[in-house]
Amino acid sequence: MKTTHTSLPFAGHTLHFVEFDPANFCEQDLLWLPHYAQLQHAGRKRKTEHLAGRIAAVYALREYGYKCVPAIGELRQPVWPAEVYGSISHCGTTALAVVSRQPIGIDIEEIFSVQTARELTDNIITPAEHERLADCGLAFSLALTLAFSAKESAFKASEIQTDAGFLDYQIISWNKQQVIIHRENEMFAVHWQIKEKIVITLCQHD
């Protein structure tokens, strides 16, 4: 499968992007993965996204001196070396990965359409959060995409990932660089940026 790697500094970390072309994917490409047999029953989309995500993860791990491919955990999560944390996300034909010494979460999302935002609002934010989003100065579809992505990154950065849902992560404030999220007795600072029609969020949880 044809891929292209680029990197971008963001919030004190290096994000590793892998653009991939699913059209020229073949099953033999998966043999690069030590755990390729675990994907034999997956659909083509899942296989291409997984492969691209692991390629991005390998680039990210190289920064820390590792030459391994993250395995698949019991909950289908990437298994990182014991001394580091990492996160992988996908959007369209883009995969993204980051590695850190502290718990970290990354997410990449295409900005919602107005219709999609309208349909998903009640599943992502509370009425109180809706008021905060309405006052943030962004188009609502963009603001809701950012809220969704920020909560995804906060969830991924949680060391103990429970069955908490989007409404359990409450946005209490935000500015042009960060979204502040509260869940139970924890606070999460989520960095964000817009890249063309894409929202990228990153949460490092100390």
Curated annotation (Swiss-Prot):
Record Pfam families: 4PPT_N, ACPS
Database matches in InterPro entries: 4-PPantetheinyl_Trfase_dom, 4-PPantetheinyl_Trfase_dom_sf, 4PPT_N, Enbac_synth_compD-like
Catalytic activity: apo-[aryl-carrier protein] + CoA = holo-[aryl-carrier protein] + adenosine 3',5'-bisphosphate + H(+); apo-[peptidyl-carrier protein] + CoA = holo-[peptidyl-carrier protein] + adenosine 3',5'-bisphosphate + H(+)
Cofactor: Mg(2+)
Binding positions for Mg(2+) per the UniProt entry: D107, E109, E152
Main location: membrane
GO cellular component: enterobactin synthetase complex; membrane
Compartments (UniProt record): Membrane
A molecular function (GO) term: magnesium ion binding
This protein's UniProt keywords: Enterobactin biosynthesis, Magnesium, Membrane, Metal-binding, Transferase
Function field: Involved in the biosynthesis of the siderophore enterobactin (enterochelin), which is a macrocyclic trimeric lactone of N-(2,3-dihydroxybenzoyl)-serine. The serine trilactone serves as a scaffolding for the three catechol functionalities that provide hexadentate coordination for the tightly ligated iron(2+) atoms.
Family affiliation: Belongs to the P-Pant transferase superfamily. EntD family.
Protein name: Enterobactin synthase component D
This protein's encoding gene: entD
